[in-house]
Swiss-Prot record:
Belongs to the BPG-independent phosphoglycerate mutase family. Essential for rapid growth and for sporulation. Catalyzes the interconversion of 2-phosphoglycerate and 3-phosphoglycerate. PANTHER family: 2,3-BISPHOSPHOGLYCERATE-INDEPENDENT PHOSPHOGLYCERATE MUTASE. It is an enzyme of class 5 (isomerase). This is 2,3-bisphosphoglycerate-independent phosphoglycerate mutase. It comes from the Bacteria. InterPro entries: Alkaline_phosphatase_core_sf, BPG-indep_PGM_N, Metalloenzyme, PGAM_B_sf, Pgm_bpd_ind. The active site is at S62 (phosphoserine intermediate). Binds 2 manganese ions per subunit. It comes from Bacillus velezensis (strain DSM 23117 / BGSC 10A6 / LMG 26770 / FZB42).
Length: 511
């Protein structure tokens, strides 16, 4: 029997704006997208800020986008969750923080605060550090030391001094805290098992080993003089007048790691917490029995306490499809495969009953501007075959190109990327329509829509622009003011499935 599949097609990084300069989305020839846009009901969706559980004005990203899409509701991201906790006074009542402070106070130990020193909002936010300093002060701590990781990636490449200045002012105002070490995130936040980098950061923090300076500003000045920008600043130790380190991390000290995004926090955390750590020799006197607090849950491998525990997402789109006995397919190339599986399922690794997954390998190239089509054609070929085989009721697909090539900040390759995706989109959607099915064509956030900054530099980051949504169903209208959290209810609506109460998003199809 022929299936009439409903598909959710995510054009990753495909934002909309009117200005065409530096806008690969507008400049690309995309006859298929344009045809669907003109022929079928369409609207725009908000994919950034509080609409996706981020702070207002914060650009969205693929993880956040797919989490919201799959959950069918606004999923408050760690950054917003912590901001709200600070705003509403929950932060200073957080028992995990208070226990870490008590450990330091009762045992005459130090409290070490470490994390990324910027307001980039991707891995951390400097305001969370300031809130911790205020809390330490209000609880009467005096031995409070900061190990700052310089960013230069989620913010400008030479912005460290701005953040160090802000920190110095806050320390002065609050009356507690001293910078003990500084390192570029390249070392302290590696996630690719380059342990030689991590070891340099670890030794600066634990042993006070590395280049030494009288102030954090001196570290940055010297680095810049040697052509080294924030991200790559060599782990350095701040010393007192007598040349001794301001602080080292000692046995039994308390540590609060205020990064909220896990991936780049795991390795350095394991280095401090794992009894069986073997990736490099930590030395005989490495600090033991630390009261180690992670802001959020980093990994099972990290032996520490968690201040903001994970929120379980029940009844995501995949779970609801499974409950109704519907067969679903998730398909993407490597770069976005975790997004259509793990993130779309609310942070769940395993498949739901009736769920099939197809992973197409991303091409092995140094950077994707060298192969803007990536593996879009292979993804399309595999999917068209699946549609013909009548196996699936629901399909969730991601085309990675506009985002991955857009990160190059290069207009021509990104135009090529979008044109390749458009060609593939046409074949996929036409195959679905030929089966009597429907497609929702949308995006998770912007990127390819701004590739040149106002000063003419390459723009490599995501954008806060709205994203398109097209539903290939004649005779219906879509409501305005939609968000990514409305997409799962819309998909369920197309399949005639009632959305669960946990999904606070609503179908975009007006009744």
């Amino acid at each position: 029997m022929s299936k009439k599949p409903a598909a959710l097609i995510i054009l990753d990084g495909f934002g909309l704006r009117n200005e065409t300069v530096g806008n690969a989305v507008a400049q690309a020839k995309k006859p298929n997208f344009d045809r669907y846009w003109n022929q079928y009901p369409h609207q725009t969706l908000t994919a950034s800020g509080e609409a996706v559980g981020l702070p207002e004005g914060q650009m969205g990203n693929s993880e956040v986008g797919h989490l919201n899409i799959g959950a069918g509701r606004i999923v408050y991201q760690s950054l917003t969750r912590v901001n709200v906790a600070i705003r509403e006074g929950e932060f200073e009542r957080n028992q995990t923080f208070l226990d870490a402070i008590k450990n330091a106070k009762d045992n005459d130990k130090a409290l070490h605060l470490f994390g990324l020193l910027s307001d980039g909002g991707v891995h951390s936010h400097i305001n969370h550090l300031f809130a911790l300093l205020k809390l330490a002060k209000s609880e009467g701590l005096t031995k409070v030391y900061i190990h700052g990781f310089l960013d230069g990636r989620d913010v400008g490449p030479q912005t460290a001094k701005t953040y160090i200045q802000q920190l110095n002012e806050q320390v002065e105002e609050i009356g507690v805290g001293e910078i003990a070490s500084i390192s570029g995130r390249y070392y302290s936040m590696d996630r690719d098992k380059r342990w030689d980098r991590v070891e340099k950061a670890y030794r600066a923090m634990a042993y006070g080993e590395g280049p030494s300076y009288r102030s954090a500003m001196d570290v940055v000045d010297d680095s810049y003089a040697n052509g080294i920008h924030d991200e790559f600043v060599i782990p350095s130790v701040i010393t007192k007048e007598n040349g001794e380190p301001v602080a080292k991390i000692h046995d039994g000290d308390s540590v609060i790691f205020y990064n909220f995004r896990p991936d780049r926090a795991i390795q350095i955390s394991n280095t401090f917490t794992n009894k069986d750590f073997r990736d490099f020799d930590r030395g005989e006197n490495h600090p033991k029995n630390l009261y180690f607090v992670c802001l959020t849950h980093f990994s099972e491998s990290v032996d520490g306490y968690v201040a903001f525990k994970p929120v379980n997402l029940d009844n995501t789109v995949g779970e609801v499809l499974a409950q109704h006995g519907l067969k679903q397919l998730r398909i993407a190339e490597t770069e976005k495969y975790p997004h259509v599986t793990f993130f779309m399922s609310g942070g769940r690794e395993e498949e739901f009953p009736g769920e099939e997954r197809i992973l197409i390998n991303s091409p092995k190239v140094a950077t994707y501007d060298l192969k803007p089509e990536m593996s879009a054609y292979e993804v399309k070929d595999a999917l068209v075959k699946e549609i013909a085989a009548d196996k699936h009721d629901a399909i969730i697909l991601n085309f990675a190109n506009p985002d991955m090539v857009g990160h190059s900040g290069m207009v021509e390759p990104t135009i090529k990327a979008i044109e390749a995706v458009d060609e593939c989109l046409g074949e996929v959607v036409d195959a679905i329509i030929a089966k009597g099915g429907h497609a929702i064509i949308t995006a998770d956030h912007g990127n390819a829509d701004i590739l040149i900054t106002e000063t003419g530099e390459p723009h490599t980051a995501h954008t806060t622009n709205p994203v398109p949504v097209i539903v290939t169903k004649e005779g219906v209208t879509l409501r305005e003011g939609g968000i990514l959290g409305d997409l799962a209810p819309t998909l369920l609506d197309l399949l005639g499935v009632e959305k669960p109460k946990e999904m606070t998003g609503t179908s975009l199809i007006q009744k």
